[in-house]
Swiss-Prot record:
Superkingdom field: Eukaryota
Name of the protein in question: Neurexophilin-3
Transmembrane feature ranges: none
Compositionally biased residues, Basic residues: 45-55
Annotated region (V (Cys-rich)), positions in chain: 167-252
Functional summary from the UniProt entry: May be signaling molecules that resemble neuropeptides. Ligand for alpha-neurexins.
Keywords attached to this entry: Glycoprotein, Secreted, Signal
One Pfam family in the UniProt entry: Neurexophilin
Family the UniProt entry places it in: Belongs to the neurexophilin family.
InterPro entries with a match to the protein in the record: Nxph (IPR010450), NXPH/NXPE (IPR026845)
Region: Disordered, residue numbers: 27-59
UniProt gene name: Nxph3
GO molecular function: signaling receptor binding
Gene Ontology cellular-component annotations: extracellular region
Amino acid sequence: MQLTRCCFVFLVQGSLYLVICGQDDGPPGSEDPEHDDHEGQPRPRVPRKRGHISPKSRPLANSTLLGLLAPPGEVWGVLGQPPNRPKQSPLPSTKVKKIFGWGDFYSNIKTVALNLLVTGKIVDHGNGTFSVHFRHNATGQGNISISLVPPSKAVEFHQEQQIFIEAKASKIFNCRMEWEKVERGRRTSLCTHDPAKICSRDHAQSSATWSCSQPFKVVCVYIAFYSTDYRLVQKVCPDYNYHSDTPYYPSG
């Protein structure tokens, strides 16, 4: 009895293994002449042949195997050919622009009764809001008002009572006090009128942060100082055209 010739092909890790099975020897007493001729010779063992798939046939074989192991949508992703995906748009840049810093805005007032230094900083957050920071250092006595005003605000002297009213009226510009800190004490120094004597003066340090939003596009700092022997009104506006992508044209 003879067994038919068989051939098995299977794929392991991208390589093709080919196993060929020859005819089995028949039972003793077989009358096959070919069997009699080769009876005295040992039957050669067919070696197991291993070969690689040709580049043309590899994608087909790989896709057949991967189709059984992975979902249809992931076949080409495993083969190194990812499917087309929509390109993600880059995130919008949220760069913070410093309109002017501590060294760009300051007001220094020195009188017989008062020594005052005010510094400020404005930061544009790029999302329609900006912050205004103030630092105040004063020795002596005097009344000072710091307000946020539009560029059209006229620089003029007012009565002392109107200064604080204007400071409260700045709320109409969508600005609010976000943080404030005040420290008070006494400081001794040489008397101004008589350097041979030592005088004690009131000393105050304060910091404040205001948060503003649109439509308050351009902000100016308005300082008004009144004392018995000195008066000062000052308006400081940043160079908005230098820091902004769109030009600003003031009106009024």
